C-alpha cells in the first residue's frame, strides 16, 4: 500500500461519480463494457461490507443519441439537407434517464444487487428538510445493502448556462458528488474521468506529467487545463474545483480513469492510482516528490561528469571498487548474515534465501568480474560507422550512454554490485531499489561502492532507493529516467511494465529447457542435466523442463537421468506421456509454464527434435534452451528454430551469464526482441548518436552539394 493512500484502510462509505465521457462511447451510445466493469467493482465493494453511493452522468448524451436516431429514421432525404437544430438538453435528459437507469438496474440485478434511483436538482438543496429526508433515505438504502444511484434531474432543472451559479450549491455532477459526499458523511469520494488523473498540462501533451498528490499551494499556479471532455459539462476544471472543495472539508478525493477495468478496486486497495486530494497533503507529499526527482537529476548530472573524465579514470574507479569490496568483506558478510537470518525467521521461501546469501567466494567472484570489466575496451565514444556524405562532410555514428537507469531487483544483493559496475563502465547514472529482505546487504554494498567514487564525479552517481512507496513516483519520471530494468518475479516485471511510460528491459520468467536427443552421449547428457538443474537451482538460467527423445524412454536412457536427478534430491513432475508410464512414479504436472527456482523440474517425452522445438517455443519464456546431441544436423535444426535469447549445444544452460560470456558482468537477461537480448552487458546500456563534421556546407535546396555517401574506414579511438 502506498503511504499516501494509507487512509483507505479506514474507509467504509464511498461515493463514486462516473462522468459522461466514461458512461458513453465516442459515438454517444452507452459504453456497456465500462458500465459492466463499474457495476462489478461496486458489487465487490458491497460484498466486502463497503457502503457505496453512485453518482452518474450520461442521461443527456444517451437521450440525445436516441432522439437523433429517431429523427434520422423519420426524415426524408430533403429533411436531411436542411440545417440541423441541436436537440434540447432537457428533452434529451428526460428520454435518456429512463434508458440509463434501466441499464444500471439490469447490470446490478445480474450481480444479485439492487439499485435505487434518486434524481435531484440544485433547488432541492435549498430546503433543509429535503436534505434531511435525502440523507435518511440514502442511509436506509445503505442499511439494506442497496446501491443508491443519484443524478441531477436535468429535465426539470431551472438553471441555465453558465452552469456555475453564484448560489454555490452545485452546477454539475462533479460538484453534486462533492456535495453529496459531505451531506452523507462519506469517507472517500472517487471521481472517474476519461483520463488517468490530473496532469500539469493537457493530457495529450507528452510533456505533461500526472500529479499523484495535489497540493494547492504548489500546483494551483502550475496547471494548464486543456479542453473539457467531448460530452460532459465541466471537464477537469470542474473536477478539480469539486475535489478541492470536498478535500478541504475533510473528505479525501481521488480523480482516476474510469476506462480502466479495476481502478476503483485499486483505489480501495491503497494503490497509487490517479490524483489524490487530501487536506493534509501539503504536510507530507512535497518532501517525497522532491526527493526521488532530485535523486534522479543528481544521478544524471553525475553521469555527465563521469563521461567527461578520461577512460583511464573510469577504469580506475572500477578497480578501486573491486579492491573496496575485498577490503570490506567482513562487514559485507556480517550485514548479509543478518539479512539471511531475518529471512529465515520470517519463513521466506528457500529459493529466495538462497539468492539472498553471500559468501567469500561470491565476493571474490564479484571483484574479479569488475576487474575484467575494467580491462575491456572503452565502450563510450566508439566510432561504429563513418560515412562521407559529400566532399568535406563526414558523418560518424558513435556509442554513448543511455542516461539514467532505474533497476528494481529482488533478494539478490550481488546484483547491486554487477549493475553498479556496468553503469559506471557505460557512463550511466543509476538508481537502485532492492528488496526489503536484502536491506542491510544493499546498504553496506552501496556505501562501499559509492565511497570509491571520486568527488569530481560524485557519489550521487548511484542512488539507493530505500522505500517501496517511492517506486510509483520514480516510474512517473520519464523525463529524467531513461530505462527501467526489473530483476525479479513475473509479478514484479509485469507490474512495472504496466505502471510506466519509461522503456522496460528484462524478462518475466526463466523457463529453461534441456532437450536430450536420441543421438546424445548419455554420459555427457547426465553431466549437463545435473549441472543445469543442481548447480544453482534458484538461478534464472537453471533448467526447469527436461525433454527427452522417445527412444530414450525405451532403451533406459530416460530412467538413468531420472535416477541421477532423484539421487541429487530433485523433485520431478511429469507431463502426460511421462505420467502414462507408471514405472517412473512421477507426480503429474499441472502446467508446463512453471519456473520452480528450486530443486524441482518438469520431465516430458517428445517424438523428435521438431516436437521439442514446438514445445519450447510454445511453453518456454525465450530465455535459455539447450540441446544435447551428437547428430550435428539435428543440433543445427534446434539452434536455428528455437526462438530464445540464448540457444546452446552440448553445454549447460548455466553458461548463459554475463560473466561467463565474457561481458564482465550483466545487468540482467533480456528476453525482449530488441537490440539488447540475452545477457545484457555494457553494450546493452549504450545507445548511439550521430556526429556530422563539415566545413561550412549548407543545404540550400541541395544545390551545389554532390552527395557521395561513401563508407570510410574506422579511425583509432581516443582514450
UniProtKB/Swiss-Prot annotation:
Keywords: Amino-acid biosynthesis, ATP-binding, Kinase, Multifunctional enzyme, NADP, Nucleotide-binding, Oxidoreductase, Proline biosynthesis, Transferase. Feedback regulated by proline. Its EC number is 2.7.2.11, 1.2.1.41. It holds the Pfam family Aldedh. Residues 1-293 are annotated as: Glutamate 5-kinase. It catalyses: L-glutamate + ATP = L-glutamyl 5-phosphate + ADP; L-glutamate 5-semialdehyde + phosphate + NADP(+) = L-glutamyl 5-phosphate + NADPH + H(+). The keyword NADP applies. Substrate binds at residues 57, 154, 173. Pathway: Amino-acid biosynthesis; L-proline biosynthesis; L-glutamate 5-semialdehyde from L-glutamate: step 1/2; Amino-acid biosynthesis; L-proline biosynthesis; L-glutamate 5-semialdehyde from L-glutamate: step 2/2. GO terms for cellular component: cytoplasm. One of its GO terms (biological process) is L-proline biosynthetic process. Residues 294-719 are annotated as: Gamma-glutamyl phosphate reductase. PROSITE patterns: GLUTAMATE_5_KINASE, PROA. ATP binds at residues 193-194, 233-239. It comes from the Eukaryota. GO terms for molecular function: ATP binding; glutamate 5-kinase activity; glutamate-5-semialdehyde dehydrogenase activity. Expressed at high levels in leaves and is inducible in roots subjected to salt stress. P5CS plays a key role in proline biosynthesis, leading to osmoregulation in plants. In the N-terminal section; belongs to the glutamate 5-kinase family. In the C-terminal section; belongs to the gamma-glutamyl phosphate reductase family. This is Delta-1-pyrroline-5-carboxylate synthase. It comes from Mesembryanthemum crystallinum (Common ice plant). The gene is P5CS.
